[in-house]
């Protein structure tokens, strides 16, 4: 008996795709599921409500193993990513060193140093890296691109001075030859000439990556996932193309490239993006010859939680955003991760927020053991399909950039910047209409929060004194317009009072008063909700007694034909009158002079801006 294999599911016959579709259609009362349940993404492909085994049988990404070309599943036989935390190095280099040593004792194994206004030489690096074992931690340096070669030379000299093995010194210098065009809006057609000294200075540091594909800037500017990946591939391919023409071998260049991606809030798509990046980059490097379909074709991916979806208001929600973002990058098998502190949008992060950010990664390692499993999403019908769909769309974009003359041409003509900025505008429109939700900002705001006093960080950190000759990326965060709206209310010294005139059908009046409170709360208005009134006259009198600036009628569609005209006439222009909903009788109500409505199809941002203008809040 012990050897008999019990067939637990023998009584359940396989269910065909057609049977599933018939059942779904029946549940939708005859409406084709394509109209209701198919997600038409911004990435250029549709996502179905269910997938089956046959959906992945012919996919190119399901046959390889981890650490096997084309490396879809992983570039290594483990998932021990590095926990990175960055340090801004100011005038006090010793203080930065003290902080670095403290971080190393708290679980960090990758350090990032932002060198600002620091004289770069061996002595400076000696002070900065004092007591740090160079071969035991990844060291990443960020400085002006004009100082990258000097930094590499100084670091190489320091490695020799302390007797460390340069082959075991891992890290990077954030040399990005396209930052001028993309971020600063300044032409840089001779970037190859600038790059050669950087490559030469790195020769004695074979494990250092000095060519950065900073696709995170695209993510922070609101790029769609396929744009971030497609342009990143074209970016990396341009480095390979132009530097091989300059005399370097493909393996010399590929081993120097580091891809810095952003991590957005689209959980499953982000997992698929990193998997697709490994696959497609391996294809690009492998196209130089079969001899490169090995270690040379392995992508090196660093991931940073995106700034685009982070908020000033209800900032602790940023913790939820960064946690799921970190999970997607860890599951996808990136090489290292930076989690931005939750307060990064409004102040210089403090010890508390940095500790929380650091522990978000350590939690996934020490408590959840994400580092013990390689590519757990492999075999998922959904994620395997997403990997292919994202890969195909990104590849199309990559080819279009190549056909148009390559990444340099695209950056110099600002075609990349314009495309990403158009996506930024589209996403802002989605935020304005709540198709893209920012919890605590454009939906379910904290009514009593005041944020103006806590903002100490100057906005526009990507600006410089350069004279722009081409269009740069627009780094306005998704929540920025709602934040500006609410901050204007705070600074005006006048807080409009919104009074909910609830009457009639109990369920509908409660639902609409809650909806309207969340609607007007996004502008920081004072909200007065009510249990209900016996008549519109009673409600209007109570509103005027409360010195309401806006009176919102909350009832059912069927009752608006009676209540709305009566309330509007009795109010007699003593406050703004709003109907919560879009009733069938709207045309009749408009004919009687009722112009203001709030409902699920409203442009929340534009509606609230209009009210701010009426109250002189700018």
From Swiss-Prot:
Which family does this protein fall into? Belongs to the methylmalonyl-CoA mutase family.
Name of the protein in question: Methylmalonyl-CoA mutase small subunit
Key word Isomerase present: yes
**Upper taxonomic lineage:** Bacteria, Pseudomonadati, Bacteroidota, Bacteroidia, Bacteroidales
Task: Name the keywords, alphabetized.
Answer: Cobalamin, Cobalt, Isomerase
Gene3D superfamilies hit by this protein: Cobalamin-binding domain (3.40.50.280), Methylmalonyl-CoA mutase (3.20.20.240)
Known catalysed reaction(s)?
A: (R)-methylmalonyl-CoA = succinyl-CoA
Which is an annotated GO molecular function term of this record?
Answer: cobalamin binding
A Pfam family per the record: MM_CoA_mutase
**According to its UniProt record, which cofactors does this protein need?**
adenosylcob(III)alamin
**Record function comment:** Catalyzes the isomerization of succinyl-CoA to methylmalonyl-CoA during synthesis of propionate from tricarboxylic acid-cycle intermediates.
NCBIfam families named among the record's database cross-references: mmCoA_mut_beta
Q: Name one GO biological process term.
A: lactate fermentation to propionate and acetate
Quaternary structure annotation from Swiss-Prot or TrEMBL: Heterodimer of an alpha and a beta chain.
EC number(s) recorded for this UniProt protein: 5.4.99.2
The pathway entry for this protein reads as: Metabolic intermediate metabolism; propanoyl-CoA degradation; succinyl-CoA from propanoyl-CoA: step 3/3
Q: Which residues constitute the signal peptide according to the record?
A: none
This protein's record includes keyword DNA damage: no
CDD domains associated with the record? MM_CoA_mutase_beta (cd03677)
């Amino acid at each position: 008996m012990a050897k008999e294999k019990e067939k637990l599911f023998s009584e359940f016959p396989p269910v065909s795709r057609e049977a599933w579709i018939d059942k779904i259609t029946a549940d939708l009362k005859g409406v084709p599921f394509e109209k209701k349940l198919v997600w038409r993404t911004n990435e250029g492909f549709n996502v179905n409500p269910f997938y089956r085994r046959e959906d992945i049988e012919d996919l190119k990404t399901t046959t390889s193993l981890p650490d096997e070309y084309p490396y879809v599943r992983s570039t290594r036989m483990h998932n021990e990513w590095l926990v990175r935390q960055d340090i801004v190095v100011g005038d006090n280099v010793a203080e930065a060193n003290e902080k670095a040593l403290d971080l190393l004792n708290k679980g960090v194994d990758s350090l990032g140093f932002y060198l600002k206004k620091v004289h770069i030489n061996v002595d400076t690096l000696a002070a900065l890296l004092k007591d740090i074992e160079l071969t035991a931690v990844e060291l990443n340096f960020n400085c002006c691109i004009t100082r990258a070669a000097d930094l590499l030379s100084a670091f190489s000299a320091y490695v020799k001075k302390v007797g460390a093995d340069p082959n075991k010194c891992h890290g990077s210098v954030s040399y990005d030859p396209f930052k001028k065009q993309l971020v600063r809006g300044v032409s840089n057609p001779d970037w190859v000439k600038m790059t050669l000294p950087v490559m030469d200075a790195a020769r004695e540091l074979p494990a250092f990556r000095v060519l950065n594909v900073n696709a995170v800037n695209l993510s922070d500017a609101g790029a769609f996932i396929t744009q971030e990946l497609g342009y990143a591939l074209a970016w990396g391919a341009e480095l390979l193309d132009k530097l091989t023409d300059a005399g370097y071998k493909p393996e010399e260049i590929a081993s120097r490239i580091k891809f810095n991606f952003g991590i957005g809030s689209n959980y499953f798509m982000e997992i698929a993006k990193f998997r697709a990046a490994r696959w497609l980059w391996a294809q690009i490097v492998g196209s130089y010859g079969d001899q490169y379909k090995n270690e040379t074709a392995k992508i090196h991916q660093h991931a940073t939680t995106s700034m685009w979806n982070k908020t000033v208001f209800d900032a602790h929600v940023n913790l939820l955003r960064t946690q799921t973002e970190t999970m997607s990058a860890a599951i996808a098998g990136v090489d290292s991760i930076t989690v931005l502190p939750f307060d990064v949008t409004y102040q210089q992060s403090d010890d508390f927020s940095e500790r929380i950010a650091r522990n978000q990664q350590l939690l996934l390692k020490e408590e959840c053991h994400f580092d013990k499993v390689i590519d757990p999403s492999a075999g998922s019908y959904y994620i395997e399909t997403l990997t292919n769909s994202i890969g195909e769309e990104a590849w199309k974009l990559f080819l279009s950039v190549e056909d148009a003359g390559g990444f340099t041409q695209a950056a110099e003509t600002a075609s990349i910047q314009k495309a990403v900025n158009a996506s930024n505008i589209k996403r802002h429109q989605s935020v304005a209409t709540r198709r893209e939700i920012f919890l605590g900002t454009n939906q379910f705001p904290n009514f009593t929060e005041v944020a103006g006093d806590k903002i100490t960080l100057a906005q526009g950190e990507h600006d410089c004194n350069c004279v722009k000759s081409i269009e740069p990326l627009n780094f306005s965060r998704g929540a920025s317009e709602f934040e500006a709206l609410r901050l204007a209310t705070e600074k005006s010294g006048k807080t409009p009072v919104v009074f909910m005139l609830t009457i009639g059908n109990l369920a509908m009046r409660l639902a609409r008063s809650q909806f309207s409170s969340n609607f007007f709360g996004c502008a920081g208005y004072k909200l007065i909700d009510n249990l209900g009134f016996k008549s519109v006259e009673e409600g209007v009198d109570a509103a005027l007694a409360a010195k309401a600036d806006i009176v919102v009628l909350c009832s059912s569609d069927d009752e608006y034909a009676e209540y709305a005209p009566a309330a509007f006439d009795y109010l007699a222009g003593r406050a703004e009158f709003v109907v919560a909903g879009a009733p069938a009788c709207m045309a009749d109500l408009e004919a009687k002079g009722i112009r203001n409505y709030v409902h699920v199809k409203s442009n929340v941002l534009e509606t609230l801006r209009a009210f701010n203008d009426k109250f002189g809040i700018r």
